[in-house]
């Protein structure tokens, strides 16, 4: 007995999958300041460690501080009817947000970092 052949119409109706253009779900990397916090900790107290919970708290604190400085700086730019954010607005925002001596130290360290960066790029 000969094998049965499928009807021609049924053979043409093969379902083809459309090529998928979906990207694979990659694990999103979150940017943290953990390595920098750890470096500063070791400069100040070489024999002290930090727990994961404390590191998360410090990271949140730094993110919050940067966000507040950026928000205040952008308000100053809009208030002065300018289009460019300069170091002057950032310094003023730091003076407004941080108390006395802490603001002075932050501004001097920031100025030092900008000067170092400017000299290295030239």
Curated annotation (Swiss-Prot):
Per UniProt, subcellular location reads as: Nucleus; Chromosome
Pfam families documented for this protein: Histone
| Cellular component annotations (GO), alphabetically ordered | nucleosome; nucleus
GO molecular function list: DNA binding; protein heterodimerization activity; structural constituent of chromatin
Q: Which InterPro entries match?
A: Histone-fold, Histone_H2A/H2B/H3, Histone_H2B, HISTONE_H2B_site
Recorded superkingdom: Eukaryota
* UniProt KW keywords: Acetylation, Chromosome, DNA-binding, Isopeptide bond, Methylation, Nucleosome core, Nucleus, Ubl conjugation
Subcellular location, principal: nucleus
Positions of modified residues (N,N,N-trimethylalanine): 2
Q: How is it modified after translation?
A: Acetylation occurs almost exclusively in the MAC.
Residues annotated as carrying N6-acetyllysine in the record are 5, 42
| Ranges where the record places region Disordered | 1-28
Keyword check for Acetylation: yes
Locate the compositionally biased regions of type Low complexity: 1-10
**At what sequence positions does the UniProt record place the cross-link Glycyl lysine isopeptide (Lys-Gly) (interchain with G-Cter in ubiquitin)?**
116
Q: How does it assemble?
A: The nucleosome is a histone octamer containing two molecules each of H2A, H2B, H3 and H4 assembled in one H3-H4 heterotetramer and two H2A-H2B heterodimers. The octamer wraps approximately 147 bp of DNA.
* Homology family: Belongs to the histone H2B family.
Q: Main role? A: Core component of nucleosome. Nucleosomes wrap and compact DNA into chromatin, limiting DNA accessibility to the cellular machineries which require DNA as a template. Histones thereby play a central role in transcription regulation, DNA repair, DNA replication and chromosomal stability. DNA accessibility is regulated via a complex set of post-translational modifications of histones, also called histone code, and nucleosome remodeling.
Protein name from the UniProt record: Histone H2B.1
Q: Which organism is it from?
A: Tetrahymena thermophila (strain SB210)
**Taxonomic lineage from the root:** Eukaryota, Sar, Alveolata, Ciliophora, Intramacronucleata
